Structures are given as structure tokens and as C-alpha cells.
UniProtKB/Swiss-Prot annotation:
Lineage top rank: taxon: Eukaryota
One of the record's GO cellular component terms: PAN complex
GO BP field: mRNA processing; nuclear-transcribed mRNA poly(A) tail shortening
Coiled coil: 526-564
Organism annotation: Aspergillus oryzae (strain ATCC 42149 / RIB 40) (Yellow koji mold)
One Pfam family named in its UniProt record: Pan3_PK
Name of protein: PAN2-PAN3 deadenylation complex subunit PAN3
Region feature (Disordered): 1-26, 59-131
Record-listed ATP binding positions: 317, 366-373, 425-426
HAMAP family, A to Z: PAN3 (MF_03181)
Domain writeup: The N-terminal zinc finger binds to poly(A) RNA. Contains a pseudokinase domain. The protein kinase domain is predicted to be catalytically inactive because some of the residues important for catalytic activity are substituted and it lacks the equivalent of the binding site for a peptide substrate. However, it has retained an ATP-binding site and ATP-binding is required for mRNA degradation, stimulating the activity of the pan2 nuclease in vitro.
Zinc finger feature spans (C3H1-type): 26-55
Length: 662
């Protein structure tokens, strides 16, 4: 049995009876599998005995079938059955050569050109010398570049019908031979190449059929990665980071939190009415509890209140003891509702009320928490250190105030109205160098019967504007009692351009020339550009801060998915669903993140550990961790990538429609 299973050396050298050599004789009619799988054979020029032309294989099979069916066909050996590259004319010569073949010749077959048909008719042994000299050059073989398809490339794979040597094209892994015995199906259906960058060229090469003008596929955004958005004002090295690169700036965060706390502030055990019309939860905002009727002619108070209609917070300004004599006076507030400007506090409503046990006039405006007035900010109003000297206002800050006030006056005058009040105690500072005109609609109701034209009131606004700037520049509220001394101080402290602009405003009542807010804005256009540039820088800074808070709820989504899967009592009538398979080590991962204990058995409450684990889970890193069950009988060594895959698959299983049993 051993001798029969292992042939001797003499038997292996007998080519006539060896099935191995018989297979090699038929190799010229067999299409190389490398062409079918990869599109070309890398050993085609290094001794591969199989055929590398699909078109020729089909022709050979068809010719063989015709010869077998034709009784008049002569008896001769086809040239394609040659195994050594020579072209003998008789079957006896072929058998003789096959009988005397050496083992070295079997292992290293001579080169066979692709278009072997052109040399198959030679009947002399001199054909061996021709086959040893290749008729192609290395320059014809192009390196594979995964670009779009072209018709020449497809034609070269399908074969050349005129018998010439086909041009060598780059290998394309997306073109395969589906049937090696059929020339029509030698090349499979052309699919889209995802590595091609020019989809339009590919569509044009294929005739434009079934190609829509759409963009290429893009991977989804990884929400656990944050791209730094400019501007980048700090020159730091690549490995350096600071707190502001990761979180919201502390001062900005504290400011927003303080404003939120001030908005939600309540005053228990107050003597204020519980409800004023449709407002409730009143909180006084005045710092001075003394009655002052200098500005409006009536004592005024300011409150914060919440609306019962929309739940928003508003500021209520109450004029104490006001009696409405003309109903048209309060209707004049409707015109102020159309004024929508960033430098003017928006007016929403006005009504009379007896909730304060008197006749009061209530104005409803926007509420800006923690805002101050210009008098409190620069003139020391409401400050307990009244004797301390106020700081000098920089000229650039003063120009910023002027441009914002001019912006508000232009919006008011464009609607056919007049501000009528430009006092430091009625201009709010809602942010850093950010001001808004307040209490503008009150005088239209209080002094409704005063017969003054709108043009005259608008010119008076210019004069009040100039007096406000002089008061701020002199740092004292009583400066207008001595205008000459005030202007001398203003001239010494500020530039001639600012001084000339203020002089122009103070002369607004003169009728020698036309004076309006548009002419004034044209005169300070250079400063408007500076203020506009500062606003653009602030917008960039806020956008950069906002980008750090992008997708800040991703960890909450992870914890939510974990809680959906863990400890689920039943799913599809399976009470052990959350305890089997990949859901089991999700439960162990939950214990690893939240239920760790130290060496003494005390709970470990470490927010940094929780955030680190959840961030790694969100990223799906390859870091491996050891998960141990509660009874210490099971232990898993898994990566965060595996845990993320298990979490997603378990969560997607919950989203599938349930199968109902009937």
C-alpha cells in the first residue's frame, strides 16, 4: 500500500502516464484564476502556463466543438496544446517531447506571450528562439492607480478582436470576470469605484448612465472630538493647553450663572402685591428706596416680574399716583412696540393698575438681569463710597457709548418718535461697554398734552445727547450747572474730534442749519467702523466659546443607553435578556464605572474616573479593561471598542419592532 501511495522517481518522470503532466498539457485552454479574481496574473511573464486571455479561451472552446462535430476535419494536434512554447505539427512530435521532458523544464516554463495565436502556425523548432525573446517592454506595464474607469481599460480586459497585442491597462479591483467561458460576460458589471475622486469623469466615461450628480460619501462626524475654532489669540505650543481650551471661560460662565440666579430670585414675605394684572412674583430692583420725582414728575419704582402668559421675566416700571385723563395717551405706546433696536430697551405694554392701593401707571419692558445705569457705573450713584473720586472714562469707551446711543436715536427718529429722556440714570449698562436707552416711551404718555412738534423734540434729543457725553466725560452729575468749566475740562481730557462732535450736538437747537441724527452719524463714521470691528471680534469670541459646548450631551446619551439596557426586567418574553450575552458585561461595565470601592470597601466617588471611562467608551478606544462580576465568578478582558459595539447592538435591538405571539 505504501508503494502504491508513493510513486517512484522513474514513475514520476514518465510524462505519458502522469496525470500532473496531462493537466499541464491542458493548461493553455484553462483561464488563469488570477485573471478571474484579480484582473491580471503577476506570474504571467514569469512562467505561468495558464491562459490569460478570456476571449481566446472562448474561441478555442468554440473551435474545438466545431472540430468534434465535423467528420471531414483533418486529424492534427491544435497548436494551443503545446506546453513548452514550441509549435510542432504532428502529435508524434508532441508525445516525443513530452516523454523526454525534464523536471527543471516542468518547474520553469518558458515565456508565453499573451497573443499566442500569432505564433502558433510556425512548424520549425526555430520558433523556440522567438518565444525566449519577449516582444514587449516594461514601459508598457502601468502601475496600478485606483482612478475612474475608461473605455480603453474595459476594452483591454475584454480582449482585442483584431489579433494585435492589447494595450496594458492598470489593474482595477472593481472589474472582475464573472464567467471565463463567455466573452460577453468576461468582464463583470462595472461598479462604482469609491477610491475615485472625480465621479463626474467616471460617469462621462461610462456614458453617464445611472449616475446622479451627488457628492461622495463622507464618514459621520465623531462627536467626541472637538475642532478648535478661531480666533486663536494666544501663542501656545502644540503640547500646551489651558483651561479655556477645554471649557467655557470662568468669568463668562460665572456671569451667566449670576444672571440666571438673579432672574430666578424671589422675595418671600414681601409687602408687594401677589399679582399685578397678568404678572406675579414681583421683586424690587431699585437700590435707592427714597422717592424721586425729578425725571418723570412722579415717583417711579422698578420691579422684576414673571408673566402668566408666556412665563418670561419682564421689568415693570411703576409711576406712583398717576391718573390717566386721556385714553389716547396710553395708546401712544403702540408706536414704541415697533422700535426693535439693539440699543433701545424694547417696550411691550402699558396699563394702569390699582394693585398697589393707588392709581399707578405700569410700563412693561425687557428685563436685563444685573444691569446697571451709567450713573451707577461711572458717576458713583448708589455707591456707598460717595467721597471716592470716579475713574476717568477712556476716550475709546466714550466713542463706543456715542455710537450706540446714535444707533438707538436713529431707530427712534426713523419711526417718527423722540426719546425725550437721555439721562445717565436711564441708560442701562447690560454688558461690558454695552448700553441701551431705557424709559423712552414714558414721557409720551405723561406729557401727552404738551404741544411740541416731533422735529423740535428730535433736535432736543441731540442736545440731551451732548449733555450726557459731557456729564460722563467730567465724571460728575452736576457738571451742567457750570457748562463753561465743564467744557474746559472736556477739551483738556479728550481729542479735538470728540470735542467738535459734542459741540455739534449741543448746538442742535440752532436753526441756522439742518441738524439731525443722520448728519451726526456721517460725521463719526470712522468711529462707527471701530465699534463695528469690536463687535465682530466679540462675535468671533462668542462663537469660539459656543463651539466648546457643542455636543456636550453626548455622555448623557451614553448613560441613557446603558440604563435602557441594564437591569431590563423582560424583553420579548425573555426575563434573562439583560443577563445573557453581551448585555452581561455591559452590566459589569456599569459596576466598573459607578460602583467601585477602595481597599477599605468604601465607595469611590470620583467624577474624573466616570468621565474618563465614558469618554473612552464614546471614542471606542482599543484600551482593554478587566470586568469582574459581583460574585467574582466571571471575569472578562474586553476593550472599550467591544463595549461600544455591544452597547450599540443591544440598543438597536430594543428599537426593533417586537414580535407578537398569536
Amino acid at each position: 500500500m505504501a508503494s502504491a501511495g508513493k510513486p517512484t522517481l522513474d514513475d514520476s518522470r514518465r510524462a505519458t502516464g502522469s496525470p500532473k503532466m496531462k493537466a499541464r498539457e491542458n493548461a493553455k485552454d484553462t483561464l488563469c484564476r488570477n485573471v478571474t479574481i484579480y484582473g491580471r496574473c503577476r506570474y504571467e511573464d514569469k512562467g505561468c502556463a495558464f491562459n490569460h486571455d478570456p476571449h481566446k479561451v472562448n474561441t478555442t472552446y468554440q473551435s474545438d466543438s466545431r472540430r468534434r462535430l465535423n467528420v471531414d476535419s483533418p486529424s492534427f494536434t491544435p497548436s494551443l496544446l503545446s506546453s513548452n512554447g514550441s509549435s510542432p505539427t504532428t502529435a508524434s512530435v508532441t508525445a516525443k517531447k513530452a516523454a523526454t521532458i525534464s523536471p527543471k523544464a516542468a518547474n520553469a516554463a518558458p515565456f508565453q506571450p499573451r497573443n499566442i495565436t500569432s505564433r502558433s502556425n510556425t512548424s520549425t523548432p526555430s520558433g523556440r528562439a522567438e518565444t525566449m525573446t519577449p516582444d514587449w517592454s516594461v514601459a508598457e506595464v502601468q502601475e496600478f492607480v485606483p482612478q475612474g474607469f475608461d473605455t480603453a481599460h474595459m476594452a483591454s480586459l475584454q480582449g482585442n478582436s483584431n489579433g494585435g497585442v492589447p494595450s496594458t491597462s492598470p489593474f482595477d479591483p472593481f472589474v472582475t470576470a464573472s464567467n471565463p467561458l463567455s466573452a460577453a460576460s468576461a468582464v463583470g458589471p462595472v461598479q462604482a469605484n469609491p477610491f475615485a475622486h472625480d465621479t463626474a469623469a467616471a460617469a462621462a466615461a461610462l456614458g453617464g448612465a445611472f449616475f446622479a450628480g451627488q457628492s461622495g460619501f463622507q464618514q459621520p462626524v465623531q462627536y467626541h472630538l472637538y475642532a478648535p475654532i478661531g480666533p486663536h489669540s494666544q501663542n501656545t505650543l502644540g503640547y500646551q493647553r489651558n483651561v479655556h481650551d477645554l471649557f467655557l471661560p470662568n468669568d463668562f460662565r460665572e456671569e451667566l450663572q449670576k444672571k440666571a440666579a438673579a432672574t430666578l430670585q424671589t422675595l418671600p414675605n414681601t409687602q408687594l402685591p401677589a399679582q399685578v394684572d397678568y404678572f406675579h412674583s414681583l421683586v424690587p430692583l431699585d437700590l435707592n428706596h427714597q422717592k424721586n420725582a425729578t425725571i418723570f414728575g412722579f415717583p417711579s419704582w422698578v420691579y422684576k416680574a414673571q408673566s402668566s402668559k408666556d412665563g418670561n421675566f419682564y421689568a415693570l416700571r411703576r409711576l406712583e399716583g398717576f391718573r390717566l385723563t386721556n385714553e389716547k395717551a396710553i395708546r401712544s405706546v403702540q408706536a414704541w412696540k415697533r422700535v426693535c433696536n439693539g440699543s433701545v430697551v424694547t417696550v411691550h405694554d402699558a396699563f394702569t393698575s390699582r394693585s398697589f392701593q393707588d392709581s399707578s401707571l405700569i410700563f412693561v419692558t425687557d428685563y436685563h438681569p444685573l444691569s446697571k445705569t451709567l450713573a451707577e457705573q461711572h458717576l458713583g450713584a448708589g455707591n456707598r463710597f460717595q467721597g471716592r473720586h470716579n475713574t476717568h472714562i477712556p476716550e475709546q469707551v466714550l466713542w463706543g457709548y456715542m455710537t450706540q446711543i446714535a444707533n438707538g436715536l436713529k431707530a427712534i427718529h426713523s419711526n417718527g418718535l423722540a426719546a425725550r429722556i437721555l439721562d445717565p440714570s436711564k441708560v442701562l449698562v447690560t454688558g461690558k461697554n454695552r448700553i441701551r436707552l431705557n424709559a423712552c416711551a414714558i414721557m409720551d404718555v405723561v406729557q401727552y398734552d404738551t404741544q411740541r412738534s416731533i422735529a423740535e423734540l428730535q433736535r432736543q434729543d441731540l442736545v440731551n445727547f451732548g449733555q450726557l457725553i459731557v456729564t460722563l466725560g467730567a465724571n460728575t452729575p452736576s457738571v451742567m450747572h457750570n457748562p463753561t468749566k465743564a467744557m474746559e475740562h472736556f477739551t483738556r481730557a479728550y481729542s479735538p474730534q470728540l470735542k467738535n462732535s459734542v459741540f455739534w450736538l449741543l448746538n442742535g437747537l440752532q436753526k441756522d442749519q439742518d441738524r439731525n441724527i443722520d448728519i451726526f452719524i456721517t460725521g463719526i463714521s470712522s468711529q462707527l467702523m471701530s465699534t463695528f470691528d469690536s463687535a465682530l471680534h466679540l462675535d468671533d469670541e462668542l462663537t469660539s466659546d459656543l463651539s466648546r459646548e457643542l455636543e456636550n450631551g453626548r455622555l448623557v446619551r451614553l448613560v441613557t443607553k446603558l440604563n435602557f439596557v441594564n437591569e431590563r426586567p423582560e424583553y420579548e418574553h425573555d426575563r434573562q435578556w439583560s443577563e445573557n450575552g453581551e448585555r452581561y458585561f455591559l452590566k459589569m461595565f456599569r459596576d466598573y464605572v459607578f460602583h467601585q470601592v477602595d481597599a477599605q470597601g468604601d465607595p469611590v466617588v470620583d467624577l474624573g474616573h466616570v468621565l474618563s471611562c465614558l469618554n473612552k467608551l464614546d471614542a471606542g478606544t482599543d484600551e482593554k479593561i478587566t470586568l469582574v462580576s459581583r460574585d467574582e465568578q466571571s471575569c472578562f478582558v474586553v476593550s472599550y471598542k467591544d463595549i461600544k459595539k455591544a452597547l450599540e447592538s443591544s440598543f438597536q435591538a430594543l428599537l426593533k419592532p417586537t414580535r407578537r405571539l398569536h
